[in-house]
Amino acid sequence: MNFNDIETMVKSKFKDIKKHAEEIAHEIEVRSGYLRKAEQYKRLEFNLSFALDDIESTAKDVQTAKSSANKDSVTVKGKAPNTLYIEKRNLMKQKLEMLGEDIDKNKESLQKAKEIAGEKASEYFNKAMN
């Protein structure tokens, strides 16, 4: 074997190694991207858990307010003030009921979003590890 043969062989091996290293670097980059996305979705899921806790706390407060509104704690003598009180109390009950329904809808939406975020986090984590 002369020097040119050795040089040619080394250069071809170097090209193979370089190509292989580039493929590995690309794979690492892709998997790192998946891990970043998985981490972002996990963080989103975590934050949505706190939002759900806040909504549940608010729902309990609204439920307490609705229960309190159903109790007649004020007695007014005379028809006119009593009628006004009843109308305002009924309006408050109606608004609290609407607020409760909105809270329930928001709670469902947040729960679905949290589930989807968890699924996406798992999906990207699995992509990164496979």
Swiss-Prot record:
Major location category of this protein: secreted
The protein, known as: Type VII secretion system extracellular protein C
Subcellular localization(s) per the UniProt record: Secreted
Family of the protein in this entry: Belongs to the EsxC family.
Induction or repression: Negatively regulated by EsaB.
Oligomer status and interactors: Forms both homodimers and heterodimers with EsxA. Homodimerization is calcium-dependent.
Keyword field: Secreted, Virulence
Role according to the record: Required for persistent infection.
GO cellular component: extracellular region
Phenotype reported upon loss of the gene: Deletion mutants display only a small defect in acute infection, but remarkably are unable to promote persistent abscesses during animal infection.
